[in-house]
Amino acid sequence: MDPPPRPRPHRVAVLLLLLLASSPAARAWKKDEFRNCNQTPFCKRARTRAPHSLDAPLSLDAASLAVATDGSLTASLSHPSRLRPLLLRLSALPPHALRLQIDEDYSSNTPPHRRFQVPDVLLPDVEARTLHLPQPKTSAAGVSTFALSSDVDVVVKHDPFELTVRRAGSGAPVLSFNSHGLFDFEPLQESKQEGETWEEQFRSHTDTRPRGPQSITFDVSFYGADFVYGLPEHGSTSLALRPTRGPGAEESEPYRLFNLDVFEYLHESPFGLYGSIPFMIAHGDGPSSGFFWLNAAEMQIDVLAPGWDGASSTENGRIDTLWMAEAGVVDAFFFVGSEPKDVIKQYISVTGTPSMPQQFAVAYHQCRWNYRDEEDVAGVDSGFDEHDIPYDVLWLDIEHTDGKRYFTWDHSAFPNPEVMQGKIADKGRKMVTIVDPHIKRDSSFHLHEEATAKGYYVKDATGKDFDGWCWPGASSYPDMLNPEIREWWADKFSYENYKGSTPTLYIWNDMNEPSVFNGPEVTMPRDAVHYGDVEHRELHNAYGYYFHMATADGLLKRGEGKDRPFVLSRAFFAGSQRYGAIWTGDNSADWDHLKSSIPMVLTLGLTGMTFSGADIGGFFGNPEPDLLVRWYQVGAFYPFFRGHAHHDTKRREPWLFGERRTALMREAIHMRYSLLPYYYTLFREASVTGVPVMRPLWLEFPDDKETYNNGEAFMVGPSLLAQGIYEEGQKSVSVYLPGEELWYDLRNGSPYKGGVSHKLEVSEDSIPSFQRAGAIVPRKDRFRRSSTQMVNDPYTLVIALNSSSAAEGELYVDDGKSYDYQQGAFIHRRFVFADNKLTSMNIAPKNLGNKKFSTECVIERIIILGVSSGSKKAIVEPGNHEVDIELGPISLRSGSSSVAPTVRKPNVRVVDDWTIRIA
């Protein structure tokens, strides 16, 4: 056999870079590797344009305004400085959503390429749900008005073009589009004009831009708003988006949405990270509102400080924003709601609700780059048992593969993967392996050979298979825009194709921004070409979305449609919530990254991605033991709860830091497991309504201004509030408890007044956390090895009475794994305490399906906070039998001595209707 060819010099250099890529020093944040606005021509052009500065602004042709047969409103827009007119389409979705679409009008001049409109993100029935708009009323002054609903109407000014969504009756504006005249729409061109240069240079990379500049810019204003939120993903300790331009702006760069592989990212920066969701929510004294732009090209968004336009005075309660995108079309949604939950629900109504996870996925995950071999896996697994720490999932990173060839195993380290998974599964646990999009260019690798033969790779600008570098070395990337290729990829997860996989193995998608080590900004060149002759610049932010989708579909097919997939993805886009979880990427083991994790996870929840979390302890670096403890105490509240670390870090399993700290981390994990019934119920709510599991305080207290920019405390559902500890050696913390009712300390039941801040002493054993008066929270208090082993355990109900001596809560239960719940196989109960009676009632919708679910689980304890301990008996109906009320522990945590009146062993089934009356 001939020796392998000698690598070309530039390949040798790149290989050296690749070998160094995993070095912390090599891959730490390097500002000059990534573009800023001034280095991004479309952003620089748009940012220098003054309001209403165009000589011939955008205008609407009144004669073209008409209601189409599908009920939408259409018109022609003219932009004299551009090549061809634009076509406007307005449509409505219930209850108060307006869709605005603007594209080039191709009717008179069809170019060789059309602008890309992102498919597959909106729910398939969005068009079918479109309402029939009435014929607008047009005034002599050139203003058209039509009703969006009984509460909201739309005003369209013709010349210059401006659109305003306002409250009907009062006429108060809620949102406006192009009120500052900043709209620009660069048309596709067939050839360069004289003197034009289309190519762009960044560092050593040239973007050929064969279709010329094609950016879009416009302004959107939010009225009655104190703050705006959203636009993940970026690192920040602020929940609200900070002004980026104008007097007193706290940032100098716009918020960038461009999915990138950023190692050890900055905790405080508007720079884009791994995912992009172009959705913004505004909240304040007026109605809540939201704006979503369906566009997968790079975006830059300015939040403009009052006076940004040089005006001597500013309109109170208005926030102006500037939206800039490199390519695409305008496909935007305006949402109006009486409160922020209404806005979230409307956004979810077009992009889809989060998928309902399996029960195990809501529990604790243990990960590291990398657990070395089967012996290491067995040792970690047994270590959790030996130290009485539950966990549900053990993860394997890239080193488990044969030379970074995904869907394979390194059989020298993992000779019996199915046996290994079986031993983990015997304890009710699962495993996860990593599958990234870069496919090793190796003629002996069947996946590469098949993808090459079928033409399934993304192409470079010359039409050849794109060849970039990532963990395996030379790599190519499947073109996930093509439905045929997604189907092919999904088939690779079958047991036949993924040898060594079992039904208890799930998947992790990393590096799917996509990451290309030798590419511009560590990603794919913008002039690479996808299915349908779509340039990568048009698709970039959705590549990871499609990869996530195809992987989830693969697990769905593997399970014959019966097993809910679990797929964690690093990259994401609007709609990714339908396919699984995400995490915040390569954070650092420092207090700042712990603090920034809360606004990041809250922002993800507001924009649909409720199943998210940050690496416990920080991915990069070695956390001080006290930091690691605090991170577990905060992270136990994340929707996605996983410990993870870089391979250059010291091992950090929870039992490696001394007996005291092990006990503290064990206690944090135990707390999460005891609250799994509550979390699972919240995930059910999210899967139906889109309301996130982990929430900003203002989502539950929308009228309380003290909550509007609180990014340190957070709600878990409607009933629990927690405040992290984010400083080393912190002795006290100020905690604001909103509302007029009491809050009860989760640890000891102590009551605290609502509507004020409390300065609390900090203890090492937990972070401040509280249950809201008026709430009932279900728990399971028997500690097991995994959540699977808790299935038949009894429940505890914790009732926190409000000033009316009342409380309520919910419990949702299904089989924790299948889709039978979609045919009615679940239990959904509401618990109501009033007039000294606790009542359980069924709230599951009828006629959902013919499948049933039942359980013999009972209520073992009912803890009542906020009541005197005078009563000694309770009467259970039906049956009219007495049970004892006695003082019992509020928490089963180690060393807890706090007690409260407790109904002991009423033993009523959660599936039944019943009443328990305090005698």
Swiss-Prot record:
InterPro entries: Gal_mutarotase_sf_dom, Glyco_hydro_31_AS, Glyco_hydro_31_C, Glyco_hydro_31_N_dom, Glyco_hydro_31_TIM, Glyco_hydro_b, Glycoside_hydrolase_SF. It catalyses: N(4)-(alpha-D-Glc-(1->3)-alpha-D-Man-(1->2)-alpha-D-Man-(1->2)-alpha-D-Man-(1->3)-[alpha-D-Man-(1->2)-alpha-D-Man-(1->3)-[alpha-D-Man-(1->2)-alpha-D-Man-(1->6)]-alpha-D-Man-(1->6)]-beta-D-Man-(1->4)-beta-D-GlcNAc-(1->4)-beta-D-GlcNAc)-L-asparaginyl-[protein] + H2O = N(4)-(alpha-D-Man-(1->2)-alpha-D-Man-(1->2)-alpha-D-Man-(1->3)-[alpha-D-Man-(1->2)-alpha-D-Man-(1->3)-[alpha-D-Man-(1->2)-alpha-D-Man-(1->6)]-alpha-D-Man-(1->6)]-beta-D-Man-(1->4)-beta-D-GlcNAc-(1->4)-beta-D-GlcNAc)-L-asparaginyl-[protein] (N-glucan mannose isomer 9A1,2,3B1,2,3) + beta-D-glucose; N(4)-(alpha-D-Glc-(1->3)-alpha-D-Glc-(1->3)-alpha-D-Man-(1->2)-alpha-D-Man-(1->2)-alpha-D-Man-(1->3)-[alpha-D-Man-(1->2)-alpha-D-Man-(1->3)-[alpha-D-Man-(1->2)-alpha-D-Man-(1->6)]-alpha-D-Man-(1->6)]-beta-D-Man-(1->4)-beta-D-GlcNAc-(1->4)-beta-D-GlcNAc)-L-asparaginyl-[protein] + H2O = N(4)-(alpha-D-Glc-(1->3)-alpha-D-Man-(1->2)-alpha-D-Man-(1->2)-alpha-D-Man-(1->3)-[alpha-D-Man-(1->2)-alpha-D-Man-(1->3)-[alpha-D-Man-(1->2)-alpha-D-Man-(1->6)]-alpha-D-Man-(1->6)]-beta-D-Man-(1->4)-beta-D-GlcNAc-(1->4)-beta-D-GlcNAc)-L-asparaginyl-[protein] + beta-D-glucose. GO terms for biological process: defense response; N-glycan processing; polysaccharide catabolic process. Keywords: Endoplasmic reticulum, Glycoprotein, Glycosidase, Hydrolase, Plant defense, Signal. The active site is at residues 510, 513, 586. Its main location: endoplasmic reticulum. It is an enzyme of class 3 (hydrolase). One of its GO terms (molecular function) is carbohydrate binding. One of its GO terms (cellular component) is endoplasmic reticulum. It comes from the Eukaryota. Belongs to the glycosyl hydrolase 31 family. Cleaves sequentially the 2 innermost alpha-1,3-linked glucose residues from the Glc(2)Man(9)GlcNAc(2) oligosaccharide precursor of immature glycoproteins. May be required for defense response elicited by pathogen-associated molecular patterns (PAMPs). This is Probable glucan 1,3-alpha-glucosidase. It comes from Oryza sativa subsp. japonica. The lineage of its organism: Eukaryota, Viridiplantae, Streptophyta, Embryophyta, Tracheophyta.
